[in-house]
Regions:
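Single conserved hydrophobic/aromatic residue that forms the stacking wall/gate
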Residues: 177-185
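Accessory alpha/beta interaction modules
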Residues: 1-163, 168-173
Length: 185
């Protein structure tokens, strides 16, 4: 018999941490499949019904102290048993995000064991939620990057995707922009 983990606290007063806190971000996604599916479907422009399964492959121990830094800060998700997604909240600009996100992306992509066929590689998506503007000369609320030919922009592969959600530009997202990226159920 499978037991569902229930996490509750008797809280009084204000909550000192928002969802930009790594622990709160991870806990919310881990506690609510609906929130996780909603987030992924909106970012990948998929109808929620297209998401058959989401599995967090590196869950945290809920209830551990929020100041504890002994947990990995990113959330790894297996989508429909086919696509690996890495979600990370980054509040402080350490001026290394491009290299850091590439490192996470490549680490997740390097998934083959000796003797496996390259056709078995799963697509990997790294999505960073940044509380700062990564490229001030190219401000954008949600940007997606892939490998492509610089001359004619032909896509080399759809197996590697990097996306950045700039939380500093959340107010700039218009209703029209949201409707343009809406997917029918």
């Amino acid at each position: 018999m499978k037991h569902k983990q229930v996490f509750s606290m008797n809280l009084t007063g204000p909550i000192d941490y928002g969802f930009r806190n790594d622990y709160m971000f991870r806990a919310a996604l881990q506690l609510s499949q609906k929130a996780l599916i909603g987030l992924i479907s909106s970012l990948l422009h998929l109808p929620p019904s297209a998401i058959k399964s989401v599995t967090i492959t590196n869950p945290i121990t809920l209830g551990a102290t929020i100041e504890d830094k002994d947990f990995v800060l990113d959330t790894n998700v297996l989508l429909n048993n086919n696509t690996l997604i890495n979600l990370e909240m980054q509040v402080n600009n350490l001026y290394n995000w491009p290299e850091r996100s590439l490192s996470y992306l490549c680490r997740n992509f390097d998934q083959l064991n000796k003797g496996q066929n390259y056709s078995e590689l799963k697509p990997v998506i790294h999505i960073g939620f940044l509380d700062y503007t990564l490229f001030p000369e190219h401000p954008e609320f949600y940007a997606t990057y892939r490998l492509l030919n610089l001359k004619d922009h032909f896509e080399y592969s759809d197996k590697l995707t990097l996306s950045v959600v700039d939380l500093k530009h959340i107010e700039s997202v218009s209703y029209t922009h949201l409707r343009a990226h809406e997917t029918p159920e």
